[in-house]
């Protein structure tokens, strides 16, 4: 396995009117567990269903209804913890987080404050070749999602859809290790990539299946190092939380605005108030939502309806044995086995389906050539037409067939691109299509020699120029390929032209 080592990036420095400042960011990612049923009921989790059609008596808090833990959701949380190199707690417990909101029918949320199912882990976030930030994970806990309030159906009424109520969430809490807006977006992207590889969350931010709460503070240069020495959070400044971010771009914009807002307050001699804020993408600014609550504000206490959750190490080991190859390991293997560059390996492993496609194309073939075709031709065409790898009309076997025809010398690179275009629009077997369209490269040296002789005989002045300047021999190569309808093998033409001209 290729050994990949990284250097930590420098923190983002923002110049204020009076001083330089550094950013400190911690994140809480709410990832919806990929499961057909909710955390404590058997109701469906299908997105987009008719309002209030996926609701059980447990979800809407009918009297006497008791929650029953969904074992699959627990397994998904364990799998996620293992994927983040985290400690799996064999004993965890559920607590009630008490607050009132119209779309929370119980009047409390079942969560895990005191004894989460997953402890400390880490995520390596690559920012550039050889540059990466190691972000520590503090904990992962399971909790229920709330419902959805709808305010735009009637000017005088609000409606509630309980379909999402009780859906399992994993809250993934990071340490304040992120040091800039770009790092924050890269962290979310890397975490989403890992979750998708694991199959524990689909990472669909548009549907709200992955949401981020972003904690932002600013401090003077050198203060972060004091925090690292003492673990005293006061060195990091007063943080504000930006809630429910569901876009990488908005995350970066919100952090940048919030940092400058806090800097302006501090440089004017004021104090930053710890609070929860919302980002308004239309105005490009954050606004106050409410004062930031502490744990005691929610009156947490152990849920009396749920026993402590005890799992066996053997069960954890079974899950560990079924773990897929994760992005970092796959990237290192692609670089080692197929000789692709760091950049290409990142592109090829960004999505699990894309990595599988590439590997099918590259297996037994030139890895660099396969990467070039997959990234430039296939991905380029998919991006242009707004398609995903699952929608591609050119399957891996077909693209592999094109590369085989190139390798055997039957078609040239230009012919291969024309063949790819035909396969994209019409489909078919590459070898059969190439044969039917007469897309066969001329490799017969006798035929090529005849064409070269004719071109040389017709252009004596050009011959003298080429003998004086060998670089001009390329003109003859182009003329021969043109004369053969683009079918002559360029390498063979080059060799014969050089021989005939005595170069």
Curated annotation (Swiss-Prot):
SMART domains: GatB_Yqey. InterPro entries: Asn/Gln-tRNA_amidoTrfase_suB/E (IPR017959), Asn/Gln-tRNA_Trfase_suB/E_cat (IPR006075), Asn/Gln_amidotransferase (IPR018027), Asn/Gln_tRNA_amidoTrase-B-like (IPR003789), GatB (IPR004413), GatB_C_1 (IPR042114), GatB_Yqey_C_2 (IPR023168), Gln-tRNA_amidoTrfase_suB_CS (IPR017958). It catalyses: L-glutamyl-tRNA(Gln) + L-glutamine + ATP + H2O = L-glutaminyl-tRNA(Gln) + L-glutamate + ADP + phosphate + H(+); L-aspartyl-tRNA(Asn) + L-glutamine + ATP + H2O = L-asparaginyl-tRNA(Asn) + L-glutamate + ADP + phosphate + 2 H(+). It comes from Cereibacter sphaeroides (strain ATCC 17023 / DSM 158 / JCM 6121 / CCUG 31486 / LMG 2827 / NBRC 12203 / NCIMB 8253 / ATH 2.4.1.). This is Aspartyl/glutamyl-tRNA(Asn/Gln) amidotransferase subunit B. The lineage of its organism: Bacteria, Pseudomonadati, Pseudomonadota, Alphaproteobacteria, Rhodobacterales. Its EC number is 6.3.5.-. Belongs to the GatB/GatE family. GatB subfamily. Coiled coil: none annotated. Gene3D superfamilies: 1.10.10.410, GatB domain, N-terminal subdomain. It comes from the Bacteria.
